[in-house]
Amino acid sequence: MLDFAIFAVTFLLALVGAVLYLYPASRQASGIPGLTPTEEKDGNLPDIVNSGSLHEFLVNLHGRYGPVVSFWFGRRLVVSLGTADALKQHFNPNKTLDPFETMLKSLLGYRSGAGSGSEDHVRRRLYGDAVTAALQSNFPLLLKLSEELLDKWLSYPETQHIPLSQHMLGFALKFVTRMVLGDTFEGEQEVIRFQKIHGTVWSEIGKGFLDGSLDKNTTRKNQYQEALMQLEAILKKIIKERKGGDFSQHTFIDSLVQRNLNEQQILEDSVVFSLAGCIVTARLCTWAIHFLTTAEEVQKKLHKEVDHVLGKGPITSEKIEQLRYCQQVLCETVRTAKLTPVSAQLQDIEGKVGPFIIPKETLVLYALGVVLQDASTWPSPHKFDPDRFADEPVMKVFSSLGFSGTWECPELRFAYVVTTVLVSVLLKKLHLLAVDRQVFEMKYELVTSCREETWITVSERH
């Protein structure tokens, strides 16, 4: 069952993957409104490509046909749900699986851990616990790296334009690599080498598999495969060292080793977190700071809370829970940026949403980017308004989508903590300012980014 689920969600990343053609799928009419196939072989793939991204395709499709829609990928029926109410009705099929993690593992070709629902649940819990334990052990390092970035920005003249996305990626990479791998990656050159490998792998996850161009370009495909092998080789070496050594620093790999996972499971989880933990954190930090530069009153209110809770002391893991408005800011950042715009589940058994029957083994997309901009759920959806999350019913809806609470993915939970620490450290000493006349265009992939670099300036608080 898990193998089939992994195959199904691979679609989100490998839209032209020939694997789908290996599984005969029903062409029966589902009765769900939507598109008929544009082409017999590719279904509606040309429509997705012409839309620019899967998210933008779904925005148009739901706008045209309503909250429950259908289309065809190859010869396979796909159903997409585009409102919170539709998602609430459907949330049943495979809740032991983390769609984000599963999508990455399917793309990377990982199949270990495929077992019963209870086994999957245990594996997911162990993975989340390992992230939490490593983060707690490395909290002083997180604070140190945040303060180093603060000092760097303080050294700039007020007119200096800072490439925000670049700095946030570098910051996230430094912390994630050392939290996962230990002091092996303390040196700048090791981080730079890892960043190059990491960038090659992630860029193809976001682009090459999305538009099918990777399979058509032998050079790029070889570079991707070589980078993935290098990434795995680095991690295998570290895993072997951590198993046989006695280290003062507790890492993510140490947490996995202590939980008696086999070497392949440890490798898979380390690769997934090294990739996803870094990118989700970098993008959340980028978007949070970007929105703070464009919302002066929000920044003032957040600075006031940071000053009240922290005073002259440093931020601690205990004080993070007291930064309630900061939590609202980050939730609104995820919503406004549509940070992870699509996830998926496989329909294990025949299901129903409203009057519509969803056939067994249908791939069901959760059009989260559409849901997060639904005016019936979020008044003034395009406005950055953290105060909306002061209302408990709003927070419950957000949690039901998997962005907080029990079902949030470990990578996002990790990113919330890291971003809270960094933003708190920066706001204590700096005003964060936007650069005039920038045009922002979102790039929708597995994790949403800015299509071009985001520039900011800073000035010291007195």
Curated annotation (Swiss-Prot):
Q: Which UniProt keywords apply?
A: Heme, Iron, Membrane, Metal-binding, Monooxygenase, Oxidoreductase, Transmembrane, Transmembrane helix
- Record SUPFAM superfamilies: Cytochrome P450
Membrane protein topology class: Single-pass membrane protein
- Its EC number is 1.14.-.-
Q: What domain of life does the native source organism fall in? A: Eukaryota
Record-annotated residues binding heme? 409
Homology family: Belongs to the cytochrome P450 family.
| Record's protein name | Cytochrome P450 20A1
Annotated organism of origin = Rattus norvegicus (Rat)
